[in-house]
């Protein structure tokens, strides 16, 4: 059986599904929450990704991965690529 993974990092959580590539049958899945609010430290997203992958049994037996994520957020980086402030999410309406 060939397994494929889908990963979705939304505003609220990171979700992982592992499916049989031939039948589409769900083999295993998991979800790890993101913090509430309109600003978030991007490190939380990475932590949630790692947690969701671990809870789904890992990816060692997976042949392919597809990733989707929330958009309309901004992560500010310095010249070295380091995060300099919490990410501003799409639901921040302070400038509306």
UniProtKB/Swiss-Prot annotation:
Q: Where is this site: Important for activity?
A: 8
Under the GO molecular function aspect, what terms does this record hold? Answer: ATP binding; D-xylulokinase activity
Q: Which reaction does it catalyse?
A: D-xylulose + ATP = D-xylulose 5-phosphate + ADP + H(+)
Q: Which Pfam families match?
A: FGGY_N (PF00370)
Q: What is this enzyme's EC?
A: 2.7.1.17
Q: Does the keyword Cell membrane apply?
A: no
The GO biological-process annotations, alphabetized, read as:
D-xylose metabolic process
Which residues are substrate-binding? Answer: 71-72
Q: Which UniProt keywords apply?
A: ATP-binding, Carbohydrate metabolism, Kinase, Nucleotide-binding, Transferase, Xylose metabolism
What the protein does comes down to: Catalyzes the phosphorylation of D-xylulose to D-xylulose 5-phosphate.
Membership in a protein family? Belongs to the FGGY kinase family.
What protein name does the entry list? Answer: Xylulose kinase
UniProt source species:
Arthrobacter sp. (strain NRRL B3728)
Identify the coding gene.
Answer: xylB
């Amino acid at each position: 059986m060939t397994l494929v993974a889908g990963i979705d990092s939304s505003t609220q959580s990171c979700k992982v599904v592992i499916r049989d590539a031939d039948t589409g049958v769900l083999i295993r899945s998991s979800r790890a929450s993101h913090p509430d609010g309109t600003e978030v430290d991007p490190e939380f997203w990475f932590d949630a990704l790692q947690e969701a992958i671990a809870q789904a049994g890992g990816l060692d037996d997976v042949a392919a991965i597809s990733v989707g994520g929330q958009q309309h957020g901004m992560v500010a980086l310095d010249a070295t690529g380091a995060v300099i402030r919490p990410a501003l999410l799409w639901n921040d309406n302070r400038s509306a």
